[in-house]
Amino acid sequence: YGRSGYAPVFRYAEETFIASGTPTADTGLTLEMSAEYTEKRYEYLDRKLRERPCCIQHTEEDFQVIIADLQLGQGFVCTLSNGEEITALAITYPIGKANWRIGEIVSDTPATKTLLLQHICQSLNLPSIRVLTPPATGESQLLGMARIINAKTMLQLYATAHPELE
């Protein structure tokens, strides 16, 4: 990949969410675990990813490929909803025989993120689950590569966005 112009650039941190032994309170939010595509799920994920300062943006076609991969690997898109509105979403897949990982998680609030993780652990009967997140500080791992195809245009865009830099 390096000879083709790719460079490892996408860093993630891995955290372990430990489920509380206490059952989740009735919040009126509903957990749904499915490996089926819906436009509503894609639109929510897309909207929440666009709120991040830097991330991999997935097209609708990319999301459909992710769904197909989840179907093959017995994974799920897990959503927490209050009626018709999604409040949190996680892409969840098994790793090994008894472990699961959240490859992506987005939510309206930190509380709904925690509640979604708690519901997932209860539903899958897990004491804990691994969660990949954008790194805040500290240790991270490289999980993706990128290649700039049109360097001149990229540099012009960067210069426009950051005029204070020389």
What is each of the regions a protein language model found here?
Residues G2, V131-E139:
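Conserved beta-strand-loop-alpha-helix junction that forms the acyl-donor binding cleft
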